[in-house]
């Protein structure tokens, strides 16, 4: 990049903090093409300053990147500790790497309708249907009130950031945990996320993109990850330095997930369902 703009290492330097800010705020990709484009913009700005003998944008200025690259396009994933029922953190894999996502469920008086929003694909919607049917068949083992008449309630499942398309089976256990939390009004444990496919029998199946999901969890300061026991081999293949500070809980069934993910504490002002 420097040679292409007629410059050398003495003309332009970039410190590690700025580089991290570029990666985190302006690029989110599996490669480095967009990173190179952003750095090229900084180099061109520096070249212009040299020619005009001015220093309009000082790299020590906190607005340095904003002045040249514009406002941030991406923001650091952050785990949210919710005190309401039905909100669970999941891990997803996209074309640009791992992401965390929040599954939100709510219930209201109605006629038994299930609404699913958040720009979700067919597979993810099917996971929501499977989760609800599993709950109806296993309410007793999940600690859910057997007297609930589902035909008298509407259930709404939402995944925020609706502008971003989402699909795949890996949110299955997150959706089911969200619904169980909603029906029992129990809190989800702090700093925990999960990923895994579910079946109508309540089995937890393995999913892909594990390394990318681990990196997303670390960015969000998540401490524990629930995943299928079949994914254990994928964890063993990941460089140990990426696993530091993380605890993995391997499960075979959804009952294992609920047992570990939910606390016995009710949320504040629980709903009577």
Predicted regions, residues:
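Glycine/threonine-rich ATP-lid/beta-loop region of ATP-binding domains
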Residues: 28-91, 123
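Peripheral, non-AAA+ core regions of ATP-driven protein-machinery
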Residues: 57, 74-80, 84-89, 97-273
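Broad structural signal for hydrophobic residues in well-ordered alpha-helices, predominantly aliphatic
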Residues: 1, 22, 65, 179-180
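Residues that form generic nucleotide/phosphate-binding pockets
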Residues: 22-25, 68, 260
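Conserved C-terminal "switch" segment of AAA+ ATPases
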Residues: 1-40, 45-58, 141-148, 186-189
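Non-catalytic, well-ordered alpha-helical scaffold segments
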Residues: 20, 33, 37-40, 63, ...
